[in-house]
Amino acid sequence: MVKCSLIRALMVVAGLVGAAAFTTPANALVELNINKGNIQPLPIAVTDFLQGDMGAQVSQVIAADLQRSGLFAPINKTAFIEKISNPDAAPRFEDWKVINAQALVTGRVTQEADGRLRAEFRLWDTFAGQQMTGQQFYTQPENWRRVAHIIADAIYKQITGEEGYFDTRVVFVSESGTKQQRKRQLAIMDQDGFNVRTLTDGSDLVLTPRFSPSRQEVTYMSFANQQPRVYLLQLETGQREVVGNFPGMTFSPRFSPDGQKVIMSLQQEGNSNIYTMDLRSRTTTRLTSTAAIDTSPSYSPDGARVSFESDRGGKPQIYVMNADGSGQTRISFGDGSYSTPVWSPRGDLIAFTKQSGGKFSIGVMKPDGSGERILTSGFHNEGPTWAPNGRVLMFFRQAAGAGGPQLYSIDLTGYNEQLVKTPSYASDPAWSPLLE
């Protein structure tokens, strides 16, 4: 289980103590425009943080986060000329320019008298000879990886001007066993595949987990007692409850942006329609009313519109409607069928799964259906989910002849596709908002 106390234990001092101790020059030169499409990764040197093994481990996670983004190219430490012995002092900038390190990260990790870890870092513009930013954090020792992710986010934001996505978690379906006796459990992990924990025991089939905006709840579909139902799971306590005891099958749940409602598909009399349920009053509202299968609803980030999948035209396509169910409009018109639409946190794009020509592809289009782009194609790619900054997607892939699915990430350029390593097969990922 994800303990809320662990999240609250992390005290972010940056902006208060950090602002006084670590200055940021207004004329720092290093920047990375990530809106230009395919860019050259920025060479960056991430030194081992002082003191000891923990400092080296923190810097390794930071470098791995930055490299995995595809926007940074951490320089091999064997090329370093200067050995940082005092992260408070200005480095020898000429030594770092020689190895083309356009940015430099230094820092230290120490243990306080009360047992907490204190982690601090400085980001330097080597060619301008200036410090760009610096922050410090306090946390319990078991949260050291979170500190590393937060520092990586701070570096990402300072250089790109946009929020990072490293201090996040992913909930997914962990799959083990043979195809004939497949065990599926809800699981949660850090976005880089570490700190995996199972949330259910695998006795029932589970599908489509989704985070609440508060990050403290997950909604998902379960076949407990042979009855397909939508459930709410409290991550702190492990307590779960059914979202409405409907006579028909409920599936494809997702929270509204304000966390007050769950939108889902309810099957009755052979067809499925989109409903919302107010989580306080438990009242339901029907949004679609067709003889087709309407499913996979997803809110726009402002909560004003909903994208969904419907086969009312003969095969699955993507539709958009207002949050009250009015103005239902088809937006996908390419070859093949479209499914699993999910709105970007930025509101500018909708990601989807497309089946055409014997392949399953992950793509994006604008909310009006224009600008369709396929990011990756293969034997079976499905279930895109957005990083909270709207720059990266995660999905699951079943390769031809493989024993089970695996998770992959890819950026909006269609480049930097990477395997997200998990202890077992994995499917149905859902990315959390940034942690607090």
UniProtKB/Swiss-Prot annotation:
Listed InterPro entries: 6-blade_b-propeller_TolB-like, PD40, Tol-Pal_TolB, TolB_N
This protein's name: Tol-Pal system protein TolB
Signal peptide boundaries: 1-19
Main function: Part of the Tol-Pal system, which plays a role in outer membrane invagination during cell division and is important for maintaining outer membrane integrity.
Annotated family: Belongs to the TolB family.
Cited Gene3D superfamilies: TolB, C-terminal domain, TolB, N-terminal domain
Domain of life (superkingdom): Bacteria
Keywords: Cell cycle, Cell division, Periplasm, Signal
HAMAP family cross-referenced by the UniProt entry: TolB
Source lineage: Bacteria, Pseudomonadati, Pseudomonadota, Alphaproteobacteria, Hyphomicrobiales
Location(s), subcellular: Periplasm
Disulfide links within the chain: none
GO cellular component: periplasmic space
Gene for this chain: tolB
GO biological process: cell division; protein import
SUBUNIT field: The Tol-Pal system is composed of five core proteins: the inner membrane proteins TolA, TolQ and TolR, the periplasmic protein TolB and the outer membrane protein Pal. They form a network linking the inner and outer membranes and the peptidoglycan layer.
